[in-house]
Design a protein with these regions (language model features):
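Active-site-flanking beta-strand signature of metal-NTP-handling nucleotidyl enzymes
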Residues: 9, 159-160
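Conserved polar/disulfide-associated segments of primarily extracytoplasmic proteins
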Residues: 24, 31-34, 45, 62-159, ...
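Surface-exposed amphipathic alpha-helical segments
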Residues: 161-201
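Short aromatic-glycine motifs in intrinsically disordered, low-complexity regions
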Residues: 37-49, 176
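Bacterial signal peptide processing site
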Residues: 18-21
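Sec-dependent signal peptide recognition
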Residues: 2-8
């Protein structure tokens, strides 16, 4: 009898202790972001200039994902601290139909991410330097939440996409996305064309 009472008391105590248990939300590591400061990308052999963060590094790239560069003006801006990079491709409108370039930009933003993105929001813009384009904000568990293209519609067409080398998770990437999104928009707003670029080395 005493054994049964002890057993019942133990079960009651165990149940009471666990009845108030609630699942705690998953936590993520706190990120210490650097202070915002910018430097100018102003290589005379490139047909564009812009400002980018001092915590980023510009690397010349011969590929834009699996697409071979058609000219030497394709670059990446790497952010080693955040395992992210901005892929930048440049195309000359004269050698490509403007409508085709715009359609390709929409295809890259929509068709390749629709199955993972919960929403895609295109935002037309005009920069302080009177250049126009569209900024794509992608919601959901995608490897990219920020894509854009910018053009003068007659000669220059530049496309950019911020990607992370990490398992796509909207909640964990949101702080870094928000931080670097400001840098992407700063790049866009400071971008200018250089009509006479010298031959690249």
């Amino acid at each position: 009898m005493k054994i049964r009472i002890i057993a019942v008391s133990f079960l009651f105590f165990f149940y009471s202790c666990n009845s108030d248990y609630t699942i705690k939300p998953r936590g993520y590591f706190k990120i210490n972001f650097p202070q915002k400061a910018y430097q100018k990308f102003d290589n005379p052999s490139y047909p564009y200039t812009f400002e980018y963060p001092v915590y980023g590094e510009v690397i010349k790239d011969s590929l834009f994902f699996d697409q071979k560069a058609e000219n030497p003006y394709w670059i990446n801006i790497n952010f080693p601290e955040f395992n992210g990079k901005i892929y930048i491709s440049y195309k000359e409108v004269g050698k490509n139909k403007f409508d085709s370039l715009v359609n390709d930009a929409f295809t890259m933003s929509y068709k390749q991410h629709t199955y993972k993105a919960s929403a895609i929001e295109p935002e037309p813009f005009i920069t302080p330097n009177n250049l126009s384009g569209i900024y794509f904000t992608l919601k959901g568990n995608t490897a990219t939440a920020n894509q854009f293209f910018i053009t003068d519609s007659t000669k220059h067409f530049l496309r950019g996409a911020l990607y992370f080398d990490a398992v796509p998770n909207e909640d964990s990437l949101q702080p870094v996305n928000s931080f670097l999104q400001k840098d992407v928009r700063h790049l866009i707003n400071t971008l200018q064309w250089r009509n006479k670029a010298t031959s690249p080395l």
